[in-house]
Amino acid sequence: MVIKAQSPAGFAEEYIIESIWNNRFPPGSILPAERELSELIGVTRTTLREVLQRLARDGWLTIQHGKPTKINNFWETSGLNILETLARLDHDSVPQLIDNLLAVRTNIAAIFIRTALRHNPEKVRDVLTQSSAVDDSAEAFAQLDYNVFRGLAFASGNPIYGLILNGLKGLYIRVGRYYFSNPEARKLAVNFYGRLEALRSEELYDQVMDVVRHYGKESGAIWHSMQSAIPRDIAEVRR
Protein backbone atom coordinates (compact mmCIF):
# COMPACT_ATOMS: atom_id res chain seq x y z
CA MET A 1 0.00 0.00 0.00
CA VAL A 2 1.32 3.46 -0.94
CA ILE A 3 0.54 5.95 1.81
CA LYS A 4 -1.03 9.05 0.25
CA ALA A 5 -2.18 10.91 3.35
CA GLN A 6 -1.84 14.69 3.24
CA SER A 7 -1.53 15.36 6.99
CA PRO A 8 0.70 13.96 9.78
CA ALA A 9 -2.36 12.43 11.46
CA GLY A 10 -3.53 10.87 8.20
CA PHE A 11 -0.04 9.49 7.54
CA ALA A 12 0.19 8.00 11.03
CA GLU A 13 -3.25 6.41 10.73
CA GLU A 14 -2.48 4.83 7.37
CA TYR A 15 0.94 3.67 8.57
CA ILE A 16 -0.51 1.87 11.59
CA ILE A 17 -3.41 0.33 9.65
CA GLU A 18 -1.08 -0.84 6.87
CA SER A 19 1.23 -2.33 9.50
CA ILE A 20 -1.67 -4.23 11.09
CA TRP A 21 -2.83 -5.46 7.67
CA ASN A 22 0.66 -6.68 6.74
CA ASN A 23 1.20 -8.33 10.15
CA ARG A 24 4.00 -5.97 11.12
CA PHE A 25 1.73 -5.38 14.11
CA PRO A 26 -0.13 -8.74 14.25
CA PRO A 27 -3.48 -9.27 16.03
CA GLY A 28 -3.03 -9.95 19.72
CA SER A 29 0.35 -8.24 19.88
CA ILE A 30 1.22 -5.08 21.77
CA LEU A 31 1.68 -1.80 19.91
CA PRO A 32 5.12 -0.18 20.40
CA ALA A 33 5.31 2.41 23.15
CA GLU A 34 4.04 5.89 22.32
CA ARG A 35 7.48 7.53 22.25
CA GLU A 36 9.00 4.80 20.10
CA LEU A 37 6.07 4.77 17.68
CA SER A 38 5.93 8.56 17.31
CA GLU A 39 9.64 8.62 16.44
CA LEU A 40 9.23 5.71 14.03
CA ILE A 41 6.37 7.38 12.16
CA GLY A 42 7.70 10.93 12.47
CA VAL A 43 4.77 12.61 14.22
CA THR A 44 4.31 14.26 17.60
CA ARG A 45 3.06 12.22 20.51
CA THR A 46 -0.03 14.44 20.70
CA THR A 47 -0.88 13.66 17.08
CA LEU A 48 -0.20 9.97 17.61
CA ARG A 49 -2.43 9.91 20.69
CA GLU A 50 -5.34 11.36 18.70
CA VAL A 51 -4.81 8.79 15.94
CA LEU A 52 -4.71 5.89 18.38
CA GLN A 53 -7.99 7.00 19.95
CA ARG A 54 -9.63 7.12 16.52
CA LEU A 55 -8.30 3.68 15.58
CA ALA A 56 -9.57 2.30 18.87
CA ARG A 57 -13.05 3.65 18.12
CA ASP A 58 -12.92 1.90 14.73
CA GLY A 59 -11.97 -1.40 16.35
CA TRP A 60 -8.33 -1.69 15.25
CA LEU A 61 -6.91 -1.29 18.76
CA THR A 62 -7.84 -1.74 22.41
CA ILE A 63 -6.66 1.03 24.71
CA GLN A 64 -6.87 0.53 28.48
CA HIS A 65 -5.57 3.04 30.98
CA GLY A 66 -2.30 1.91 32.51
CA LYS A 67 -1.88 -1.01 30.10
CA PRO A 68 -0.10 -1.38 26.75
CA THR A 69 -2.21 -0.81 23.63
CA LYS A 70 -3.28 -4.11 22.08
CA ILE A 71 -3.78 -4.90 18.38
CA ASN A 72 -7.22 -6.37 17.71
CA ASN A 73 -8.38 -8.92 15.17
CA PHE A 74 -10.23 -6.24 13.22
CA TRP A 75 -12.49 -8.78 11.49
CA GLU A 76 -14.02 -9.45 14.91
CA THR A 77 -13.98 -5.96 16.40
CA SER A 78 -14.52 -3.43 13.60
CA GLY A 79 -17.64 -2.27 11.79
CA LEU A 80 -18.73 -1.57 8.23
CA ASN A 81 -16.89 1.75 8.27
CA ILE A 82 -13.57 -0.01 7.54
CA LEU A 83 -14.71 -1.53 4.22
CA GLU A 84 -13.19 1.26 2.14
CA THR A 85 -9.95 0.95 4.06
CA LEU A 86 -9.79 -2.79 3.39
CA ALA A 87 -10.41 -2.19 -0.31
CA ARG A 88 -7.52 0.30 -0.43
CA LEU A 89 -5.20 -2.02 1.47
CA ASP A 90 -5.48 -4.94 -0.93
CA HIS A 91 -6.67 -4.24 -4.47
CA ASP A 92 -6.54 -7.94 -5.35
CA SER A 93 -9.19 -8.69 -2.74
CA VAL A 94 -11.60 -6.04 -4.03
CA PRO A 95 -13.63 -8.35 -6.33
CA GLN A 96 -14.32 -10.80 -3.49
CA LEU A 97 -15.03 -7.97 -1.06
CA ILE A 98 -17.57 -6.47 -3.46
CA ASP A 99 -19.12 -9.88 -4.18
CA ASN A 100 -19.70 -10.22 -0.45
CA LEU A 101 -21.09 -6.69 -0.26
CA LEU A 102 -23.57 -7.36 -3.07
CA ALA A 103 -24.63 -10.68 -1.53
CA VAL A 104 -25.35 -8.98 1.79
CA ARG A 105 -27.30 -6.22 0.06
CA THR A 106 -29.46 -8.70 -1.85
CA ASN A 107 -30.15 -10.87 1.19
CA ILE A 108 -31.20 -8.07 3.52
CA ALA A 109 -32.96 -6.06 0.79
CA ALA A 110 -35.25 -8.99 0.03
CA ILE A 111 -36.49 -8.68 3.61
CA PHE A 112 -36.68 -4.92 4.14
CA ILE A 113 -38.17 -4.12 0.72
CA ARG A 114 -41.02 -6.57 1.23
CA THR A 115 -41.70 -5.11 4.67
CA ALA A 116 -41.57 -1.57 3.29
CA LEU A 117 -44.04 -2.32 0.48
CA ARG A 118 -46.43 -4.01 2.85
CA HIS A 119 -46.39 -1.49 5.68
CA ASN A 120 -45.34 1.83 4.14
CA PRO A 121 -46.45 1.87 0.47
CA GLU A 122 -46.73 5.67 0.25
CA LYS A 123 -43.14 6.14 1.38
CA VAL A 124 -42.01 3.44 -1.05
CA ARG A 125 -43.73 5.31 -3.87
CA ASP A 126 -41.90 8.50 -2.89
CA VAL A 127 -38.55 6.69 -2.81
CA LEU A 128 -39.05 5.03 -6.20
CA THR A 129 -40.22 8.28 -7.80
CA GLN A 130 -36.60 9.49 -7.65
CA SER A 131 -35.75 7.19 -10.55
CA SER A 132 -38.05 9.02 -12.97
CA ALA A 133 -35.83 12.11 -13.22
CA VAL A 134 -32.31 10.71 -13.00
CA ASP A 135 -29.60 11.73 -15.47
CA ASP A 136 -28.33 8.88 -17.63
CA SER A 137 -24.85 8.90 -16.11
CA ALA A 138 -22.82 6.59 -13.90
CA GLU A 139 -22.46 9.23 -11.18
CA ALA A 140 -26.20 9.95 -11.05
CA PHE A 141 -27.16 6.27 -11.00
CA ALA A 142 -24.63 5.40 -8.31
CA GLN A 143 -26.18 7.99 -6.02
CA LEU A 144 -29.73 7.08 -7.05
CA ASP A 145 -29.27 3.36 -6.43
CA TYR A 146 -27.84 4.00 -2.99
CA ASN A 147 -30.66 6.43 -2.17
CA VAL A 148 -33.32 3.95 -3.35
CA PHE A 149 -32.01 1.05 -1.27
CA ARG A 150 -31.38 3.27 1.75
CA GLY A 151 -34.80 4.88 1.43
CA LEU A 152 -36.52 1.50 1.22
CA ALA A 153 -34.50 0.29 4.20
CA PHE A 154 -35.80 3.11 6.39
CA ALA A 155 -39.31 2.73 4.92
CA SER A 156 -39.36 -0.80 6.35
CA GLY A 157 -39.75 0.69 9.82
CA ASN A 158 -36.61 -1.01 11.11
CA PRO A 159 -33.89 1.66 11.27
CA ILE A 160 -31.16 -0.96 11.71
CA TYR A 161 -31.41 -1.77 8.00
CA GLY A 162 -30.90 1.91 7.25
CA LEU A 163 -27.88 2.08 9.52
CA ILE A 164 -26.35 -0.88 7.67
CA LEU A 165 -26.78 0.99 4.38
CA ASN A 166 -25.25 4.08 5.99
CA GLY A 167 -22.19 2.01 6.85
CA LEU A 168 -21.88 0.76 3.28
CA LYS A 169 -22.28 4.19 1.65
CA GLY A 170 -18.71 5.10 0.76
CA LEU A 171 -17.72 1.86 -0.95
CA TYR A 172 -21.25 1.34 -2.34
CA ILE A 173 -21.19 4.62 -4.27
CA ARG A 174 -17.59 4.23 -5.45
CA VAL A 175 -18.35 0.77 -6.81
CA GLY A 176 -21.58 2.12 -8.25
CA ARG A 177 -19.73 4.75 -10.29
CA TYR A 178 -17.88 1.97 -12.07
CA TYR A 179 -20.76 -0.52 -12.29
CA PHE A 180 -23.22 2.03 -13.67
CA SER A 181 -20.77 3.13 -16.35
CA ASN A 182 -22.27 0.11 -18.15
CA PRO A 183 -25.51 1.17 -19.91
CA GLU A 184 -26.95 -2.32 -19.38
CA ALA A 185 -26.56 -1.88 -15.62
CA ARG A 186 -28.48 1.40 -15.75
CA LYS A 187 -31.23 -0.16 -17.86
CA LEU A 188 -31.51 -3.14 -15.50
CA ALA A 189 -31.80 -0.85 -12.47
CA VAL A 190 -34.58 1.23 -14.03
CA ASN A 191 -36.50 -1.94 -14.86
CA PHE A 192 -36.03 -3.15 -11.29
CA TYR A 193 -37.34 0.07 -9.78
CA GLY A 194 -40.31 -0.10 -12.15
CA ARG A 195 -41.02 -3.68 -11.16
CA LEU A 196 -41.00 -2.72 -7.48
CA GLU A 197 -43.46 0.08 -8.16
CA ALA A 198 -45.74 -2.39 -9.97
CA LEU A 199 -45.60 -4.79 -7.03
CA ARG A 200 -46.41 -1.92 -4.69
CA SER A 201 -49.39 -0.65 -6.67
CA GLU A 202 -50.76 -4.17 -7.21
CA GLU A 203 -50.04 -5.22 -3.60
CA LEU A 204 -48.12 -8.29 -4.77
CA TYR A 205 -45.95 -8.39 -1.67
CA ASP A 206 -45.24 -12.11 -1.82
CA GLN A 207 -43.37 -11.65 -5.10
CA VAL A 208 -40.90 -9.12 -3.73
CA MET A 209 -38.25 -11.58 -2.51
CA ASP A 210 -38.09 -13.37 -5.86
CA VAL A 211 -37.88 -10.07 -7.76
CA VAL A 212 -35.08 -8.77 -5.53
CA ARG A 213 -33.10 -12.00 -5.73
CA HIS A 214 -33.54 -12.14 -9.51
CA TYR A 215 -32.22 -8.59 -9.75
CA GLY A 216 -29.31 -9.61 -7.54
CA LYS A 217 -28.42 -12.42 -9.94
CA GLU A 218 -28.75 -10.29 -13.06
CA SER A 219 -26.80 -7.36 -11.64
CA GLY A 220 -24.21 -9.81 -10.32
CA ALA A 221 -23.73 -11.22 -13.82
CA ILE A 222 -23.08 -7.74 -15.20
CA TRP A 223 -20.69 -7.01 -12.35
CA HIS A 224 -18.73 -10.21 -12.94
CA SER A 225 -18.35 -9.30 -16.62
CA MET A 226 -16.71 -6.03 -15.53
CA GLN A 227 -14.44 -7.34 -12.76
CA SER A 228 -11.33 -7.80 -14.88
CA ALA A 229 -11.13 -4.06 -15.54
CA ILE A 230 -11.81 -2.73 -12.03
CA PRO A 231 -9.91 0.58 -11.62
CA ARG A 232 -7.10 0.33 -9.09
CA ASP A 233 -8.32 3.52 -7.43
CA ILE A 234 -11.93 2.35 -7.04
CA ALA A 235 -11.75 2.65 -3.25
CA GLU A 236 -9.83 5.92 -3.16
CA VAL A 237 -11.54 8.97 -1.72
CA ARG A 238 -12.01 11.72 -4.30
CA ARG A 239 -10.20 14.88 -3.23
Swiss-Prot record:
Known Pfam families for this protein? FadR_C (PF07840), GntR (PF00392)
* GO cellular component term, pick one: cytoplasm
Check the record and name the SUPFAM superfamilies matching this protein: GntR ligand-binding domain-like (SSF48008), Winged helix' DNA-binding domain (SSF46785)
GO BP annotations listed? fatty acid metabolic process; regulation of fatty acid metabolic process
DNA-binding region(s) from the entry: 34-53
Signal sequence, renumbered to the chain: none
The alphabetized UniProt keywords are: Activator, Cytoplasm, DNA-binding, Fatty acid metabolism, Lipid metabolism, Repressor, Transcription, Transcription regulation
Start and end residues of each HTH gntR-type domain: 6-74
Xref: CDD domains: WHTH_GntR
| GO molecular-function term, one example from the UniProt record | DNA binding
Which InterPro entries does this entry report, sorted A to Z? FA-response_TF_FadR (IPR014178), FadR_C (IPR028374), TF_FadR/GntR_C (IPR008920), Tscrpt_reg_HTH_GntR (IPR000524), WH-like_DNA-bd_sf (IPR036388), WH_DNA-bd_sf (IPR036390)
Locations listed in the record: Cytoplasm
Q: Main subcellular localization, coarse class?
A: cytoplasm
User: What role does this protein play?
Assistant: Multifunctional regulator of fatty acid metabolism.
Under the subunit heading, UniProt states:
Homodimer.
Question: What's the protein here called?
Answer: Fatty acid metabolism regulator protein
Could you tell me which species this protein originates from? Pectobacterium atrosepticum (strain SCRI 1043 / ATCC BAA-672)
